[in-house]
């Protein structure tokens, strides 16, 4: 679980140039004689909210495992693939208590809708963070085919009273399905089309880029765009998926919180959703209300809306 705090405002005398991460490229004799880039020219890796403060909280790891794990309980490692639901809940509460105003959850636990297990602890943690601590919670919708995740039906024309098709859900994506408190993010490709592997479900709120992702390596901090091979003979695997889409939207949420500090977490989510580029049907279970538009989220004239999710106030 990663948490993102709103970025501080830039100094008044700061220019629009991003800081340089290295010297300009040298010019060779057969290159055209053009002026070199000025000092401080960007290197192309800036990020959505480069001034945000990031707190990294590890709630699951391949390097560790529970002591004497049991597969009998609903939150067992055999049934819940991404850590445990309880460890996610503890991480969310810890992040909220540390003062994080945006919480990114780029992990997904997929369970059969007929047997979703006991998720009351996680639900209470999400309610606490979103309602009591006023944190924007952004989660990955999930990737079809990974750890029990699978696509749900898009729409049932025989039941217009249920436009998001909740009654036909076969696999729940947690924490995304707690959609009153969580903004679930699907993935699009480089052309803005829904990524085939992006898990569909009625909880998906918006979508963001999920391919051609650049990031920073945990070893050395240099730019990377793929996972290294895990076995001899394998090739690098480019970054893709809804985990990266969720991180993208978390950065947008940090910018919105910095620009509009008076908005509640629920109102920040409303601004991101209302400014998205809608799919042809207006909303669907793959893209939600559409592709996120950071500039529109920061500049459009959008009514603030309700301060809390419907019914949340009664539980405060």
Feature locations, PLM:
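Substrate-binding/specificity loop regions of serine endopeptidase catalytic domains
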Residues: 109-205, 212-246
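Structured segments of extracytoplasmic/periplasmic soluble domains
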Residues: 94, 98, 106, 128-132, ...
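Hydrolase catalytic cores
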Residues: 210-287, 291
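Topogenic and prosegment regions of secretory-pathway hydrolases and membrane enzymes
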Residues: 7-34, 93, 97-102, 133-136, ...
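Soluble non-cytosolic domains of exported or imported proteins
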Residues: 11, 78-86, 116-120, 169, ...
